[in-house]
Amino acid sequence: MSQLKLEEISSVIEEKIKNFELDCDMAEVGKVVSYADGVAKVYGLNGVMSYEVLEFETGDKGVAANLEEDSVGVIVFGFGNNIKEGTSVKRTKSLMKVPVGDAVVGRVLNALGEPIDGKGEIETNEFSLIEQKAPGIMDRKSVHEPLQTGIKAIDALVPIGRGQRELIIGDKQTGKTTVAIDAIINQKGQNVICIYVAIGQKESTVAQVVRKLEEYGAMEYSVVINASASDSAAMQYLAPYSGVAMGEYFRDHARHALIIYDDLSKHAVAYREISLILRRPPGREAFPGDVFYIHSRLLERAAKLCDEKGAGSLTALPIVETQAGDVSAYIPTNIISITDGQIFLETDLFYSGIRPAINVGLSVSRVGGAAQIKATKQVSGTLRLDLAQYRELQAFTQFASDLDEASKKQLERGQRMVEVLKQAPYSPLPIEKQVVIIYAGAKGFLDSVSVKKVVDFEEQLHPFLEAKYPQVLEEIHTKKVLDKDLEAMLRKVLEEFKLTYSE
């Protein structure tokens, strides 16, 4: 009897030993040595990768930014109020990733790609690293397709092409964000996904932007990433990289995307704050030595891909805020040298009622001309020169009252062209309508219209064309060039409208 029991016991023990599984969770763990201002110094993590995501026992997360001989400098997402000396830190062995694809479209996210719009979780299996290598020379193609903003002054004088980087620069309160929002609204029906990255903006300002996009039906094809002024410097620093990762998904899947960084001045300030806390040596204006590189590696990811890669594109419109119109400061000059041109907005023009307040003389597009449609080129070919001569004459008339007839005529024409380029915010104009009104101004159809009535003339001209001659607009849209027949027809239409137009 006792023999049997012993056998039973030994067989049970053997069975248990055979089926025994040890669930052990292997993790590399370090300890926080010090924590201040959103940066933790961690000891005991030797094999950490640069910008690897680390998890704190408090539930906070961060990335390894400084890899030193015996410690790691970790930038903490959020404010890490519960982190203190001795807190455990665990490696995740993965780099920073954000959700990408169509699942993020129409959503408002934070810098980590987490939804903050109260519309539930993002259901997707597609994630992308926020730090990716920019496409090489052989993977690219010259910019040749237009990306129309719907703003006459931009599409005629500083045209933007798909895959271009065009800087919007100016003092605060000059309408920089409005130009960017107009560009987003104008992409409706163009199969372009738009990403708006707000860096260091007020929450109320971002809420206003989202409301505007919803009002014009633009949120259907847009993503908003918000790292507001109340967020930590780490979140403000990461936001543009999260945004560009989402844009790259569409670029690499043979689609088109537009990304707006609003603004990179605040991004540079956030990076300066992080770098100084990490005790990296400061350089000019106390910015670290690699502040140029953080922007160049971000903006180089905007590209027009070659046909073999699917011919997708990512267009970038970075915004930079200047102080008292000083474009020669450190960050503005850096970004001017990285981008393919700039749109310069001026306070004086803004307050004198010329809106959008684009300084035509200082604004330039280095590659967009190749993307401009032929019809726009035909009507705006001499526009820049005419406006420059008008500004010169205008300055001259302040001292001399007696002008010859030719100069008077030029002055009159210039005044009307300035009026033609004025545009209300959030009212982008299709390219065919832009061609018509610029043609009317350039060919003298507005010479007999008083300067104050030019805007009214335009407001009445478009409905007249849509009602009586929709084929003219349709032909400009499809042909993209003003041939002799179309030009003759356009002249006839404008002459007929002038007879019916009463001031």
Swiss-Prot record:
Key word Nucleotide-binding present: yes
Keywords noted in UniProt: ATP synthesis, ATP-binding, Cell inner membrane, Cell membrane, CF(1), Hydrogen ion transport, Ion transport, Membrane, Nucleotide-binding, Translocase, Transport
Positions of ATP binding: 170-177
EC number(s) stated in the UniProt entry for this protein: 7.1.2.2
MF annotations from Gene Ontology: ADP binding; ATP binding; proton-transporting ATP synthase activity, rotational mechanism
Record's bilayer topology term: Peripheral membrane protein
Function as written in the Swiss-Prot or TrEMBL entry: Produces ATP from ADP in the presence of a proton gradient across the membrane. The alpha chain is a regulatory subunit.
Quaternary structure and partners: F-type ATPases have 2 components, CF(1) - the catalytic core - and CF(0) - the membrane proton channel. CF(1) has five subunits: alpha(3), beta(3), gamma(1), delta(1), epsilon(1). CF(0) has three main subunits: a(1), b(2) and c(9-12). The alpha and beta chains form an alternating ring which encloses part of the gamma chain. CF(1) is attached to CF(0) by a central stalk formed by the gamma and epsilon chains, while a peripheral stalk is formed by the delta and b chains.
Sequence similarity: Belongs to the ATPase alpha/beta chains family.
Database matches in HAMAP family: ATP_synth_alpha_bact (MF_01346)
Stated name of the protein: ATP synthase subunit alpha
